[in-house]
Amino acid sequence: MYNQSFSGKELYRLTTQVERRDFGLEKNGFIKSIDDEISSALLNRTYSFKFKVVNGLFLNGLSHTLPDERFTYLCQDLILRKIYQNIKKIYNVRQADRNKIVQQIQMLLDSKKDYWIIRLDVKSFYESLDRTAILNRLYKQYRLSPLTTLLLQKIFEVPIIKESTGIPRGLSISSCLSELAMKYFDIEIKQYTGVYYYARFVDDIIIFCATKECMDNLWCLIPKKLKELSLTINITKSKKISSKELKESDANSLIYLGYSFSLKETVKDGEKSNWVLYTDISHQKVDKIKTRITKSFVNVIKNGDVGLLRDRIKYLTGNYSIKNKQTLLPVKAGIYYNYKRIDSRCLYMSPNEYI
């Protein structure tokens, strides 16, 4: 049976190799230190959280955290990780795999049969979710341990979170709470007659319908269903498109998760042949990268920090390795690895050419 407790032993399981190395404690010593730090406050139900806000994100700890408080805030982070894990395990919720969704979309777009697509963007997703409804659902179902629900309650009683709306963007618990809020909406749309593919990555939704009627009906129904969750559609970023429309003009493309999908007819021996799917980075993403490059050059004029400029350009346009905190092994990152499903390099090279 899954253990929902917040003992030092359970929280130690959630530490990374980097954290174990940085604090220089062997396993039993680490577990004892965690228990010494938080067990009394948890037992007496007096534990309190401290958060800061940076660029609209709620983060663990205070902006003036002192070196000797590092372990205190590590323990707070471990508690947040345990709350996240408890919700994820008990309610079987998890965020979708972005790369897997893109791969599936490529297969569907490349099929020979007709399809009708709805692509939706939910406006201010985290900030608009009804936190009261989500928390009441957790409190009334008694599936989480009493301590887990109490700690959740204490998180939302922290003044800077209490004064905000929705789910706090940036905290580890936010993704599982939002997935829980959307769980039955996702199931209902997946099971709707005529839908043969549905995916949602946070606030981005895509639906493949077998008929135009299904597409039109859902286009009207979904805003009503989202309204029940206190959510609204960002109509300027939402779109209906059919396989026929994708083929009619080069200007027609499907933009989703930072990718641009388009169908182009190949010409062989002077005659039109098969339709080929092209997958690139979307123009919007490329433009955003170019804007950040421009700001980086403007910034170096002000501060003269060429080294910082070099790092920023590498981050924006190149590929690099970072250490996985869990395993300490190098992990590939960068623009190519963020968009590994592209099959044309014309837009991928565009930021470098811009420099």
PLM segments and residue spans:
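Glycine- and acidic
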Residues: 64-68, 120, 163-171, 202-204, ...
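Conserved polymerase palm-domain catalytic core
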Residues: 109-202, 206-225, 253
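Hydrophobic, Leu/Ile/Phe/Ala-enriched alpha-helical segments that form helix-helix packing faces
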Residues: 34, 38, 42, 86-87, ...
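Right-hand nucleic-acid polymerase module
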Residues: 1-47, 51, 72-81, 85-96, ...
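Conserved short beta-strand edge segments in small beta-sheet-based binding/regulatory domains
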Residues: 230-238
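Conserved pre-motif C helix in the palm subdomain of viral-like polymerases
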Residues: 57-92, 164-190
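Reverse-transcriptase-like RNA-dependent polymerase core
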Residues: 37-61, 147-159
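Alpha-helix N-cap recognition
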Residues: 97-100, 211
